[in-house]
Amino acid sequence: VAYSGLVDGDTFNGTYTGAFSDKNVGTGKTVTITPSYTGADVSNYSITNHADVTANITVRSLNVSGVTASDKTYDGSVTATMNSSSAVYSGFVSGDDFAASYSGVFADANVGTGKTVTITSSYAGADVSNYNITDQTSTTADISAKALTATASASNKVYDGSSAATVTLSLSGFVGSETVTSTNSSTFSDKNVGTGKT
């Protein structure tokens, strides 16, 4: 800092603080200077303070990690339930108005472990534009098999010398209109006449 008009040898010191007009990203932003002067000879001067200056505030990098997807039972869809309770926002300035939401889809609807879930991120809040955000793009989760319930009924028959049985098998618990084809080979416990035979 140059002091025009300062007499050589005088005891005079100046310190300065500055404040931007606001905290947000921008170029050529006004910085208001607040001076403080000390020294034995300060009272000998009528001081014209430094004019305000300009400077830039650039975007801050923000890296997102730790978003997870919940395992699920097969339901015929690729939709994943996301969990951001353990998300980490590296570079976030505490107190900023910033909110994040996430949706996810499995690579396919089929049963499997460690399946890739693609993450779609959405951010809101007054301070979002102050960040250059590197999204978390994927995670993994499992799809487990859905249980089906089988019911069976055997047909009565007239003694024919064999233990062969005719059984009708019914399955319930399918997703939507899905079905499977099933076959069975069934026999009575023996070939003889009886009631309530296994």
Where are these regions (language model features)?
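Short loop/turn motifs that initiate or flank beta-strands
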Residues: V1-T198
